[in-house]
């Protein structure tokens, strides 16, 4: 079975082909970051138009990369949501039109399920069951995973997602879009313990997250440390970025440990754009070592939105649907 995957939920156009016998045989990705940078964030209408321009050419490139013809494709998976409505509509329309023309099934895939299963593409893939930490610009969730399609939401952000909080705080520091990535780089040069940020919602039971208060705390810290010219010196920027990042990471670690204790599981899977954060990866690895557990995450290119995770998830779903009963 060979599945074509199409991802168009936000500002990346991703197309990939997953082969049941060979694994991932094609992976094409186009990022719109440079286009949206001038606006300080994603402009939905521009995103949709760019997906229209890029999706079909990327499909042609993916088929060429895999040395396949349309007749070799057994199904098409596409991101059905969540995401930008117009962008999703582009991907779903193209996927369903091609599926009709090629006489193969089309399957809508939940964007976060794609992220959740992305670590399964690695050689050192996790076995079920596990706890998944899905952490991106739009979501921060802890999920109990017992198998494909067997998910239980344990906790999630009640306001800003972790990635969103990174981006907004980075913007307060005067960083260009995408500010979250730039802020993590700043944090590497920060002085530990100069600023003490709170660890929100860790003083009460439960597995939900809240990061909007950290953004407000950062705004107040920035205001209190402006010089006579109304600016922050570079080291203070680094120190604030470091304190903010450490607060987010510590909060996530506390919640992950609770989720593992609640489920009794020893495997933690992390996925989503923020899972590429070096500090988060290092601290989670250290925590899991102390807990005598394992942590898994995808390679950096599969942390952000991509077609590979959609193709693979579509393959797993269609394979399950085709199993004899």
UniProtKB/Swiss-Prot annotation:
Cofactor list: Fe(2+)
Q: Where does substrate bind?
A: 134-138, 167, 180, 277
Q: What is its main location?
A: cytoplasm
Which BP terms in the Gene Ontology apply to this protein?
tRNA threonylcarbamoyladenosine modification
Compartment(s) where it occurs, according to its Swiss-Prot or TrEMBL record: Cytoplasm; Secreted
* Ranges that cross the membrane: none
Q: A Gene Ontology CC term for this entry?
A: extracellular region
Q: Where is the signal peptide?
A: none
The record's listing under InterPro entries reads: ATPase_NBD, Gcp-like_dom, KAE1/TsaD, Peptidase_M22_CS, TsaD
**Which transformation does this protein catalyse, written as a reaction?**
L-threonylcarbamoyladenylate + adenosine(37) in tRNA = N(6)-L-threonylcarbamoyladenosine(37) in tRNA + AMP + H(+)
Q: What is its EC number?
A: 2.3.1.234
Name the enzyme group at the top EC level. Answer: transferase
Binding sites annotated in the UniProt record for Fe cation? 111, 115, 305
Cofactor binding note of this UniProt entry: Binds 1 Fe(2+) ion per subunit.
Q: Care to name a GO molecular-function term for this sequence?
A: N(6)-L-threonylcarbamoyladenine synthase activity
Keywords assigned by UniProt, alphabetized: Acyltransferase, Cytoplasm, Iron, Metal-binding, Secreted, Transferase, tRNA processing
Q: Which PROSITE patterns match?
A: GLYCOPROTEASE (PS01016)
* Residue runs in coiled coils: none
Which family is annotated? Answer: Belongs to the KAE1 / TsaD family.
- Protein role: Required for the formation of a threonylcarbamoyl group on adenosine at position 37 (t(6)A37) in tRNAs that read codons beginning with adenine. Is involved in the transfer of the threonylcarbamoyl moiety of threonylcarbamoyl-AMP (TC-AMP) to the N6 group of A37, together with TsaE and TsaB. TsaD likely plays a direct catalytic role in this reaction.
Q: What is this protein called?
A: tRNA N6-adenosine threonylcarbamoyltransferase
Q: Which organism is it from?
A: Mannheimia haemolytica (Pasteurella haemolytica)
Task: Output the lineage of the source organism.
Answer: Bacteria, Pseudomonadati, Pseudomonadota, Gammaproteobacteria, Pasteurellales
Supply the gene name: tsaD
């Amino acid at each position: 079975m060979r599945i074509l995957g199409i991802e168009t939920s936000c500002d990346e156009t991703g197309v990939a082909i997953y082969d049941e016998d060979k694994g991932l045989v094609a992976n094409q990705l186009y990022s719109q970051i440079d286009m949206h940078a001038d606006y300080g964030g994603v402009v939905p209408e521009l995103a949709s138009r760019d997906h229209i321009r890029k999706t079909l050419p990327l499909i042609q490139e993916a088929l060429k990369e895999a040395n396949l013809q349309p007749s070799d494709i057994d199904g098409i998976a596409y991101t059905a949501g969540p995401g930008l409505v117009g962008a999703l509509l582009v991907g779903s329309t193209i996927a369903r039109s091609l599926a009709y023309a090629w006489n193969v099934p089309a399957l809508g895939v939940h964007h976060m399920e794609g992220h959740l299963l992305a670590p399964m593409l690695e050689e050192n893939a996790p076995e079920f069951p596990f706890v998944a930490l899905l952490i991106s610009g739009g979501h921060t969730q802890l999920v109990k995973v017992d198998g494909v399609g067997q998910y239980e939401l344990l906790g999630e952000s009640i306001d800003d997602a972790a990635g969103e909080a990174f981006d907004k705080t980075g913007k307060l520091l005067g960083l260009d879009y995408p500010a979250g990535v730039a802020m993590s780089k700043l944090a590497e040069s920060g002085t530990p313990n100069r600023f003490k940020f709170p660890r929100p919602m860790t003083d009460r039971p439960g597995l939900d997250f809240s990061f909007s208060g950290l953004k407000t705390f950062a705004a107040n810290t920035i205001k209190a440390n402006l010089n006579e010219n109304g600016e922050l010196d570079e080291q203070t920027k680094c120190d604030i970025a470091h304190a903010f990042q450490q607060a987010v990471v510590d909060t996530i670690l506390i919640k992950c440990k609770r989720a593992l204790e609640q489920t009794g599981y020893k495997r933690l899977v992390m996925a989503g754009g923020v899972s590429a954060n070096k500090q988060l990866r290092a601290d989670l690895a250290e925590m899991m070592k102390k807990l005598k557990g394992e942590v898994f995450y995808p390679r950096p290119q599969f942390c952000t939105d991509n077609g590979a995770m959609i193709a693979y998830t579509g393959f797993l779903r269609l394979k399950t649907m085709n199993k004899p009963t």
